[in-house]
């Protein structure tokens, strides 16, 4: 019967398993350390995201504020020309007209450089995206054809900045 109660070998095996298996306190400490590392990484990622959002907002504000900076710089030469014309002691009408013509060419060149183009609708079919009809008139032209331009329109790239004010032909009755 004493042989049945000998359990030295299993106790030794269980004892050796106890030595290799970490205790609950060690597992808890390891889990707490991992959780602290993950929390710290999350806080850093959150701070980085907030910094990126703030920098992006600042970049948008700067872009909005200085979007016309180069356009404005180009217009300074036009302003200088107009001021020089006004400063002339006794400009003749021809000289003044030549100066205004050159200034208009300068201004048109600046507009072209920045993709600001005239809308020239005379003789074209009325387009409500590009034209604003002020009046419908009797004309020999086909119906809905622009017959008179009262004020030029302008496009910036593909967007209408200001529609052309036009008179449109009425359909023949």
UniProtKB/Swiss-Prot annotation:
Name of the featured protein: Protein GrpE
Family in the record: Belongs to the GrpE family.
Keywords: Chaperone, Cytoplasm, Stress response
NCBIfam families registered for this protein in UniProt: PRK14139.1, PRK14140.1, PRK14150.1
Organism: Thiobacillus denitrificans (strain ATCC 25259 / T1)
Signal peptide: none
Basic and acidic residues bias spans: 1-20
Location relative to the cell: Cytoplasm
């Amino acid at each position: 019967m004493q042989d049945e109660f000998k359990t030295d070998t299993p106790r030794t095996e269980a004892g050796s398993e106890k030595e290799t298996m970490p205790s609950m306190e060690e597992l808890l400490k390891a889990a707490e350390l991992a959780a602290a590392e993950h929390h710290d990484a999350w806080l850093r990622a959150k701070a980085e995201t907030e910094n990126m959002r703030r920098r992006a907002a600042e970049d948008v504000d700067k872009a909005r504020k200085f979007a016309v900076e180069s356009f404005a710089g180009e217009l300074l030469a036009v302003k200088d020309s107009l001021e020089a014309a006004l400063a002339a002691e006794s400009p003749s009408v021809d000289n003044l007209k030549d100066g205004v013509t050159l200034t208009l060419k300068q201004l048109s060149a600046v507009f072209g450089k920045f993709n600001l183009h005239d809308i020239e609708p005379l003789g074209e079919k009325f387009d409500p995206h590009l034209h604003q009809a002020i009046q419908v008139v009797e004309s020999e032209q086909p119906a809905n054809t622009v017959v008179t331009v009262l004020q030029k329109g302008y496009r910036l790239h593909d967007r209408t900045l200001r529609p052309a004010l036009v008179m449109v032909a009425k359909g023949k009755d």
